[in-house]
């Protein structure tokens, strides 16, 4: 009788009508059916939410963060790190077209000058500033130079794009100290230091957007890229903590959970439905600001590209984590073998 009463209580709690003529076994089956229906419903709602975020629901307007195409003298500034190639360059170009003045931060003064000239030619009236920093060095004088460059600017957007991965998949024990330290200095330390420089002003002005370039390697931990994966996992947790801290000051934080994009970092040259060009990717990001996309249920995180969003949803809600680790390990081992073979052939033909 106690079991029957307990099941009755559970059924009432989930809103199911109780038939007191049911046996305990029958009632248990009804309860399990209810739980199953709830699980399937939740599963379906998450999928619907994904498609709505990616294809239907509008994102935040960039005017929320100070874009002003009509009067660029009153427009806010966007600071973009890693701004001379790939995704970073595309963010700089598109944010300028949206009505922001641009601070370009990257390693090469020559490339910085080239991208600044490109922006000013394409979007007359947009002002640019440049700052050369080799983030791997952790040079205090270079950080002071950036601080001087942004001092007094009304910065509405910060794009922490700069990043570094391993030259090829490698076990942690075989990773060189130089490569390991470069990855942490670029992917973690630079993000913290630049953000600490910029975000207090956003908080004071009660307006801002911080976009941190993440990676699937930080969500689905990637063997053979352990240090890189760990650096991106850090960004995921840090972005969520930061987002909660500054949201009451109207500063929006979003970790962009990114799968493959055509870029120097990914070493991929051909685009597809699953692998966008930087232009396609950034267009989608700016169109869906404030939406989670495939990062359903993860605060301050977005997976905006449709193909990436589906992979994110599947790896989160469908595929077993242990299987993913094993599969990813096998893929990275194969990638390493191909890279070593290619390097060996290059040496022989030299």
UniProtKB/Swiss-Prot annotation:
EC nos: 1.1.1.330
CDD domains referenced in this protein's UniProt entry, alphabetically: 17beta-HSD1_like_SDR_c
GO biological process, one term: very long-chain fatty acid biosynthetic process
Keywords, in A-Z order: Endoplasmic reticulum, Fatty acid biosynthesis, Fatty acid metabolism, Lipid biosynthesis, Lipid metabolism, Membrane, NADP, Oxidoreductase, Transmembrane, Transmembrane helix
Location in or out of the cell: Endoplasmic reticulum membrane
Positions bound to NADP(+): 79, 134, 161, 196, 228, 232, 261, 263
Known pathway: Lipid metabolism; fatty acid biosynthesis
Catalytic activity: a very-long-chain (3R)-3-hydroxyacyl-CoA + NADP(+) = a very-long-chain 3-oxoacyl-CoA + NADPH + H(+)
Domain of life: Eukaryota
InterPro entries hit by this protein: 3_ketoreductase_fungal, NAD(P)-bd_dom_sf, Sc_DH/Rdtase_CS, SDR_fam
Family that this chain belongs to: Belongs to the short-chain dehydrogenases/reductases (SDR) family.
Function: Component of the microsomal membrane bound fatty acid elongation system, which produces the 26-carbon very long-chain fatty acids (VLCFA) from palmitate. Catalyzes the reduction of the 3-ketoacyl-CoA intermediate that is formed in each cycle of fatty acid elongation. VLCFAs serve as precursors for ceramide and sphingolipids.
HAMAP family named in the record: 3_ketoreductase
Protein name (record): Very-long-chain 3-oxoacyl-CoA reductase
Naturally occurring in which organism (per UniProt): Mycosarcoma maydis (Corn smut fungus)
Lineage: Eukaryota, Fungi, Dikarya, Basidiomycota, Ustilaginomycotina
């Amino acid at each position: 009788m106690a079991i029957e009463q307990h099941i009755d209580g559970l059924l009432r709690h989930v809103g199911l009508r109780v038939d007191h003529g049911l046996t305990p076994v029958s009632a248990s089956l009804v309860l399990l059916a209810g739980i199953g229906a709830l699980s399937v419903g939740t599963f379906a709602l998450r999928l619907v939410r994904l498609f709505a975020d990616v294809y239907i629901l509008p994102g935040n307007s960039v005017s929320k963060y100070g874009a002003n195409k009509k009067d660029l003298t009153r427009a806010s500034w966007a600071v973009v790190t890693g701004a001379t190639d790939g995704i970073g360059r595309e963010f700089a170009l598109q944010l300028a077209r949206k009505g922001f003045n641009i601070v370009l931060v990257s390693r090469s003064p020559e490339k910085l000058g080239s991208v600044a000239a490109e922006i000013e030619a394409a979007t007359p009236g947009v002002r640019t500033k440049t700052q050369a920093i080799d983030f791997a060095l952790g040079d205090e004088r270079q950080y002071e130079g950036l601080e001087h460059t942004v001092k007094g600017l009304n910065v509405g957007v910060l794009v922490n794009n700069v990043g570094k991965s391993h030259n090829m998949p490698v076990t942690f024990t075989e990773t060189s100290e130089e490569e390991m330290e470069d990855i942490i200095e670029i992917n973690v330390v630079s993000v913290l230091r630049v953000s600490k420089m910029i975000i207090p002003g956003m908080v004071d002005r009660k307006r801002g957007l911080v976009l941190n370039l993440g990676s699937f390697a930080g969500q689905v931990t990637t063997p053979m890229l352990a240090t890189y994966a760990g650096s991106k996992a850090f960004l995921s947790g840090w972005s969520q903590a930061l987002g909660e801290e500054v949201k009451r000051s109207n500063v929006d934080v979003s970790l962009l959970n990114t799968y493959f994009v055509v870029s120097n970092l990914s070493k991929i040259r051909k685009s597809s439905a699953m692998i966008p060009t930087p232009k396609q990717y950034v267009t989608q990001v700016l169109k869906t600001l404030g939406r989670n996309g495939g990062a359903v249920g993860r605060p301050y995180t977005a997976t905006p590209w449709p193909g990436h969003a589906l992979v994110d949803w599947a790896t989160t809600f469908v595929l077993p984590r242990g299987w993913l680790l094993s599969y990813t390990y096998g893929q990275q081992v194969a990638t390493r073998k191909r890279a070593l073979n290619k390097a060996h052939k290059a040496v022989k033909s030299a």
